[in-house]
Structures are given as C-alpha cells and as structure tokens.
A protein has these predicted regions:
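Interfacial "coupling" helices/loops that link adjacent transmembrane helices in transporter permeases
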Residues: 6, 10-13, 255-299, 374-377, ...
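Short cytosolic juxtamembrane segments of multi-pass membrane proteins
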Residues: 1, 364-379, 785-791
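Small-residue-rich transmembrane alpha-helices
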Residues: 263, 296-326, 339-364, 399-403, ...
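Alpha-helical transmembrane segments, especially those used as permease/efflux helices
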Residues: 9-20, 30, 239-242, 255, ...
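Juxtamembrane segments of multi-pass membrane proteins
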Residues: 420, 425-426, 432-576, 581-594
Length: 791
C-alpha cells in the first residue's frame, strides 16, 4: 500500500518509466502479432488444385530464398503419369513458368508470369471472355490489362518483344499460351497439380500421392499449399521478421535502461526520505521492497496500456510494413489472445529487472542520511564504477587501433566493439567527467557579467548526479545514431565504388520496368552481358547464382570466359564443393538436366555471381533467362528503341542502383533502429529533467527572492538543460569517432580505393534537436507552473 501511495504522490518522477514500459510493451505486442501471423497464401493460379506435388527442397541458407530444384524432364513425366493413374484423379498437370510481360507494364526481378494453357486448370479463376489459345501467336491475358479478344498485344519475352493476338481474357493474373509454345519458352517442372473427380476426398488422394512420390517430392494439400507462395514474398517476410525482432529486442533492452535510469535518479533524490524511514525503524529489506513495489505498480499500469495499444495499432503497423517493403502485399495480421498477455508479463518483468540496482542503492541508505542538508554530490561515482569505466574505455581504445588493421570480416565487429566499449566507458565515467569538463568548457561564464551565467555553470558542476543522468542517454543515443547511420552510408558508398572499379566499360545498359534485358536488347550492345540464372551444385540441391557470359566477358572483368563444357566458379563455391581448377563439376540447370563441366578458373568472391557458364549453355537450359546488365565497351552510345524497355546509364550509376532495393530496406531498417533508440532517449531525458525540475522548487524560490524575473529564471533553467544536452552530444561524437575513422581506414586498406566518411547529418541534427526540445520543454513547463504558485 505504501508503494502505491508513493507512486501516486510522485507520479511525475515515474512518468518516464510508465511511458517507456507502455511503448516497449506496445512494440513487443505488435511485433509478436505480425511475426506469428500466417502471411503466406496459396497462389491464386494454383489454388484450384486440391492436391499439389512440389519437387524436393534444395539447400537454403539464411536470408537467401530460391526455388526448389526442378525435376529432370524424364522424372517429371514419369511422376506425372503415375500421379494421373491414382484413384479419383482426373488429370495430373505439370506447371511451367516463363517470362512474359505486356508492354508498358512493370514486373519485379525474378517474376515469371507466363504459363501453358493446360496449367490454367490449376487456377481458382478461369476465362472471363473468349477462348483458349490454339495457335502459337495466340495468348490469353488478364482482363485487367484492358484487352479484348481479337486485339493485338505486344508481349515482352526473353527473346524480345513478340506480337500476339488475344484469344481470351482471364479473371486473374498470368499470360497463357499453347502448351507447345510454352515448352519452348519455359524451364523445368517444379510443381504438378492434381485435378480430382467431384466428391473425391483430397486427404485420401494426398496420402496415395505421398506413397507414389516417396522421397522424390512433397505432397501439399489444404493450408500447406502456402509453401508454393513466391520466394520473393518469403524473403520479404523473412526480412520483415528480422526487422521486427530487432526492434522488439531493442525496445525491451532500452526500456530496462530507461526504467533503471529513472529509478536511479529518483532514489538519489530521495535519500533523506529513505534515511527518515530507516530512522523510524524501516529495514533495508523493507526499503528494497518499497522500491520494487513502486516499479511493480508503474510497470503493471504501463504494461496494460501498452498491450492494449499494441493490439489496436497492429493492423496499422502491418500497413506501414507493407508500404515499406517489409511484408508482401495482401499480408494480414491475425489476433492471438495470449500475445498481449505475454507482452504484459514481459513488461512487468522488464520493469522489475530495471529497478534492481536502484532498489539495492535504496537499501544501503543509512539513518543519518535524514540529517543531510547539502545538495552537493560529494561522491558521485563509486570506485567500482570508476574501474569498470576505465576498463571499458581501454577496451574501446584497443578495438579502435584494431579496426585500422583488420580484414573485412573483423572490421565491422571491431568498429562496433569500439563504439560500444567507449560509449559504455564514457557513460560509466560521466559522473566523474562532467564536473571537470563542464568546469573547463564553461570557465568563460564565470567571468561573464550577471548572475544567470554563473548559476548555470555552478548548478551543473554541483548537481553532478542530475547532470550525468541527463548526459548519459544523450551520449549513448548520439553515439549509436552516428555510428550506425554513418557506417551504413560509408560502407554502401565503398561497395558502390568497388563494383564500379571492378568493371572496365564505357556504360551499362539496364532494364526499365522489366526483370531483365531480353536477347533483342542485348544484341544492340557491343560488349558483355550477364545472363542471370540459377544452377544447383553438388548433389543438385545447393542453389548457386549463375550467369551466362560471352567472349567479351574478359574485356570487362579481366577473367577468361568459359567456353564449351567449361565453368568458372568463385573461391567460396569451389571450397564448399571441393572443386579445383581442372576438375569436373556436376551442375543441375534450370530445365532439370545435369551437365558435367570442367572448372577452368577460380575467381575472387567479389564477382557478381558464384558461377559463370558459356552464354549458349544457359540459354539452352533456361529459355526464359534475362540479362541483369549489358556493359558497352565501345565509345559510341547504344541506340535503344523504346520497345526494348532498356536504358543506358553510367557504370557508376549502375553500381549504385544494382542493390538499390536491398540498400533501401537496410537504410529503412537502420533509421527504424535509430528512431526507436532516439525515442527512448527522449523519454529518459524528459523524465530526468522533469523530475529534477519538479524537485527544484526551493531553487526557483531563491532565484525569485534574489530579484530574478520569471523570464530570467526560465532562461537559466533552459540554458542549463541545453548545455547538458550539448555535452552529451559531444561525448557521443567522441565515442563514435574512433570507430568511424578506423572503419574508413580499414575499408581503404581492404579495397585499395579512396573511401570517404559519410555522416548522416540530418539524423544527427534531428536526434540532438529532439533531445534539446523535449529537455527544454520538460524544464520550462513545470518551472512555469511553480512560478505561478509563488507569491
């Protein structure tokens, strides 16, 4: 009961803790609801088949999602026939896909929307108008494109633009041609759909299909058919999951920090109160229980508000994630009752964990503290804290030196270790640093005419605990924001420079609104192109990115091109599969056939693909392959007709745009982390300043009695807050600077290229300005209330 009473009485002191717990629980609730939702859906064009058989899964690595290896052509046909003979099965339809795109539309990389007409039977939609295609120049298209039967349509294919006549329209997406024409354009078979007789039990047929398939595939029925959702959507969900997990963990961690700092400052300001309780008989254990009770009360109320807020805002967060590209279109969040309950419990636990140090400090208060009158912090830092701070700073200095000589693998870890160690060290040493540092930096104020300047200086030096409690969160956030944003920008710029320097070409021809360049577009370019495909190494299960190249490949990359039955692989691939120069590598290609190719060269892992094949080999086995880029090696610009959907840009521009989508997602992820940390910092700063200002009624009264006007009082308090925030920002920059300069030096040594440091000034300015704004508001607003109450 005493804990509840003190929590109500000192609500301003615990306001920051309440907000931090509420926001943390809200973020955890929203993140968990999205992560646990079944975002995948059965593709519409396959949803009409109750039973689907998928080819065996390949070897997947974290963050890389590729299609399953296709069956060998003969195996696919034999399996289709066996499945078609099962009781209750009307037909077994192989699904094939190839690149097809109407002119003036857009598709993302990797999409293949063309299919044989027989596969239309697997869709849950059908013809809306017209008839199926009969001849090679007929096609059925999505009616949303606006075409009607009989109209001509230009469709982009891997060969180039082709003219078709629309024979019919569908109620769903896709381009459907005759089976014979599709066989020439498509690769291998990865899915076989089973069409059942009316009234047939799909579960029974699926069981029979599993016996027939054995280990040669996976039988899917019902909700399990969601496994056939596009791999691009699966990758998007995976990226979104990483983002949500990181934000939730960061929120929980920073909530502990805010709760800890809030209660630590509150306990430091209540030493006389605790000393008085000890004087009247309270034991150290009772004081510890009192502080824990206050944390439990504040944490429970904050967690309840946060859980409710998280449930309400989860759909809104889902929409934001979809717009940002962290969840696929059509993703829907589902509510699970136990998620907010678990988040509530987590919030309470986090509050109790955060208050541990403060409760121990309260239990060590002596009864004589009740007699303490002075507000001067005579011993702001313990010996243990000083030793820990010096040790962390020393570790940071060692890591900083190491970044200048580290390789690419250790560079990021050492840079992160430098910043984290220096930030931790300076934060621990803050109570001992702020006095001398502020004394030195504000010495001119001591000679400034007028009392306000002297008061600002002396208040900061005297109230070391209050000053360091405000400096610490600003220091940590500025260091984190500067390190993360600047490191991301610097490494992205360095990677762009590396890619551009590795290519010897005059210009790059890139696709415009299409997944890649067709053969017709590549034929216009005098130079080398990279015909993108996927091959499967070893036992035919390990997916490898591959490119088909021509003889001009050597002029661009200074690597002899593969010819005939040869292949070039990167060092990592060679090591993983035990391939050496001169050995034969067995590769399964896009049509399911296996080729044995002799390794003629092992190249550096910095190459854009893992495997390089002769261009005609890729085209023979992957009729729908598209080139990601074609490099022009001649001085004259390439004439590109509009119908080819291609543009010519500089090599540097292509290097910057090659991973533009990935860089965009990484940058959004980075800014989200910075925003979360900055938000909690603002809470910590505002809470500390609000608590401190509410407890400085005597200071305000003395200033007024000394002749200061209300305006002078407010300006004095605001100036003090601004100086403290500025000091925190300066220390944060000092903590991040060694890591950043070490990273730049390491990148220069690693790449052999000039690398410049890129600072994200807008975000740095925004973080500092936000802390200043909230800190000043938390100082001035309660001070104005106090001034109104004074006579």
């Amino acid at each position: 009961m005493i804990s509840l009473a003190t929590a109500r009485e000192r609500w301003t002191s615990f306001l920051g803790c309440f907000v931090a717990v509420a926001l943390g629980v809200a973020v955890v609730t929203m993140s968990a609801l999205v992560l646990l939702s079944d975002g995948a859906k059965v593709p519409e064009r396959l949803a009409g088949a109750p039973v689907l058989v998928q080819s065996p899964a390949g070897t997947q690595t974290g963050g890389v999602f590729t299609e399953n290896p296709p069956w060998a052509p003969q195996s696919a046909e034999e399996l289709r026939r066996e499945l078609a003979r099962l009781p209750g099965v009307v037909d077994a339809v192989p699904d094939r896909s190839f690149y097809a795109q109407a002119a003036d539309t857009e598709q993302r990389r990797g999409e293949r929307q063309g299919h044989p007409w027989s596969a239309a039977a697997l869709a849950e939609y059908g013809l809306s108008e017209g008839r199926p295609p009969v001849t090679a120049d007929e096609i059925v298209v999505d009616r949303s494109l606006g075409f009607t039967p009989g109209e001509p349509v230009t469709v982009l294919t891997a060969r180039g633009p082709q003219r078709f006549s629309v024979s019919g329209t569908m109620n769903g997406p896709g381009y459907y041609v005759t089976d014979r024409w599709a066989a020439e354009l498509a690769g291998g078979v990865r899915t076989i759909g089973l069409l059942l007789e009316s009234g047939t039990d799909a579960t029974r047929v699926a069981a029979a299909a599993r016996r027939a398939v054995g280990g040669d595939g996976t039988v899917l029925t019902g909700a399990s058919r969601e496994a056939l959702a596009p791999k691009q959507d699966e990758m998007t969900r995976w990226i979104g999951g990483q983002v949500l997990t990181a934000i939730a963990l960061l929120s929980a961690f920073v909530t502990v920090f805010v709760v800890s700092s809030t209660f630590a400052f509150a306990v430091a300001g209540r030493r006389r109160e605790f000393g008085l309780l000890r004087t009247i008989g309270a034991t150290p254990r009772q004081l510890k229980r009192l502080v824990y009770g206050e944390a439990l009360a504040v944490g429970a109320v904050g967690a309840a508000a946060g859980a409710l807020l998280g449930v309400v805002l989860a759909p809104t967060m889902t929409g934001v994630l979809i717009d940002a590209g962290f969840q696929p279109a059509g993703f829907e969040v589902s509510l699970r009752w136990w998620v907010p309950v678990a988040a509530f419990a987590t919030g309470v636990v986090v509050a109790l964990v955060g208050v541990g140090a403060a409760s121990r400090r309260a239990s060590r208060v002596k009864p004589l503290e009740a007699m303490r009158e002075a507000a001067v912090d005579n011993r702001p830092m313990t010996r243990r804290r000083r030793v820990a701070g010096l040790a962390a700073t020393g570790v940071g200095a060692v890591c900083s030196v190491g970044t200048a000589f580290a390789g690419a693998d250790a560079l990021v870890l050492l840079a992160l270790g430098t910043a984290m160690s220096l930030t931790t060290g300076l934060t621990l040493l803050a109570p001992g640093l702020v006095g001398p540092v502020i004394g030195a930096l504000t010495r001119p104020l001591a000679r400034h005419p007028g009392a306000p300047a002297v008061l600002v200086r002396e208040n900061m030096i005297t109230a070391v605990r209050r000053t360091s409690a405000t400096v610490a969160p600003v220091l940590a956030t500025v260091a984190f924001a500067v390190l993360i944003t600047s490191t991301v920008q610097t490494t992205q710029n360095a990677d762009t420079a590396r890619q551009a320097a590795a290519v010897r070409a005059e210009a790059a021809v890139v696709p415009r609104g299409t997944p890649g360049l067709s053969d017709a577009a590549v034929a216009r370019v005098e130079g080398a192109s990279l015909l993108s495909t996927t091959v499967y190494g070893g036992d035919g299960r390990a997916a490898l990115s591959a490119a088909g190249v021509s003889s001009a490949f050597e002029r661009v990359y200074a690597v002899p091109p593969p010819q005939g039955d040869t292949v070039v692989v990167t060092a990592a691939v060679a090591a993983a599969h035990g391939w050496r120069k001169g050995q034969v590598a067995s590769l399964t290609l896009e049509d399911g056939r296996t080729r044995r190719l002799r390794v003629t060269a092992v190249v550096d892992d910095s190459m854009p693909y893992q495997v390089f094949l002769p261009r005609d080999v890729v085209r023979d086995h992957d009729p729908s392959a598209l080139a990601d880029v074609a490099y022009r090696t001649t001085p004259a610009p390439t004439p590109l007709p509009a119908g080819l959907s291609a543009d010519e840009i500089s090599v540097e521009a292509y290097a910057a745009s090659d991973d533009a989508e990935e860089d965009r997602l990484v940058w959004i992820f980075t800014l989200l982390l910075v925003a979360v940390s900055a938000g909690y910092t603002a809470i910590a700063v505002a809470s500390t300043v609000l608590t401190a200002t509410a407890g400085r009624v005597r200071d305000v009264r003395v200033l007024r009695l000394s002749g200061a006007t209300p305006r002078q009082v407010l300006l004095t308090l605001a100036a003090e807050t601004c100086c403290v925030v500025a000091l925190g920002a300066a220390l944060g920059l000092a903590a991040a600077a060694p890591a950043l300069f070490g990273t730049v030096h390491g990148l220069r040594e690693e790449l052999g290229l000039p690398v410049e440091l890129s600072l994200a000034w807008p975000w740095l300015t925004g973080v500092v300005a936000g802390c200043l704004l909230l800190g000043t508001a938390a100082t001035v607003l309660p001070a104005r209330v106090v001034l109104r109450r004074l006579p």
